[in-house]
Amino acid sequence: DYVDYAKKDADGIVREDLLLTMSEKLNEVVDRLEKLGLVILKDENGKYVTRGNRNLKINGENIKPILAEAALQKENVSVLNRVNIIDYAVEGNRIKGAYGIGIENDTFYIIEAKAVIIATGGAAGLYKPNNPGFSRHKMWYPPFNTGAGYAMGIKAGAEMTTFEMRFIALR
């Protein structure tokens, strides 16, 4: 159902295998978020409140603080707030970390890691927003998502796929 919906929304330009994998894992991820404290609105009978026939109502503004708190509870995890990653540290054909600059203190960071995941949130900031005038950046996606993480990955030799695919957040 989700794969068909997303395929139709994208005029057929999708990788169905990726859509299927995402849809198969979505409920599990949402359940984990709810256990971490994300409020998913429910009616008096305990059933999820929907917005239309494909969306649940959530308090989504709390997702980042909830995930940040969960990350802080993990062993061997450091959180660097307000650090802008400027490039990946590459050795041979492996990304071994990243370089960053503290945006409040101009500190240069050398970060070493066993694994690096590019999770930059898209590149919506490349496009002109639909909203006019002073409301230009009152939109779902942050205007600062310019695709820099993708560009760093490509420069480092990472394989990239499905840039044409738009994520549709449905459950």
Task: Go through each PLM region and give its residues.
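Well-ordered beta-strand positions in beta-sheet-rich domains
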Residues: 108-112
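Conserved N-terminal/central alpha/beta ligand/cofactor-binding core
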Residues: 1-102, 107, 119, 123-136, ...
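Acidic, metal-coordinating catalytic segment for phosphate/diphosphate chemistry
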Residues: 153
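A short acidic, glycine-rich active-site loop
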Residues: 136-145
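Amphipathic alpha-helical segments in well-structured domains
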Residues: 64, 146-149
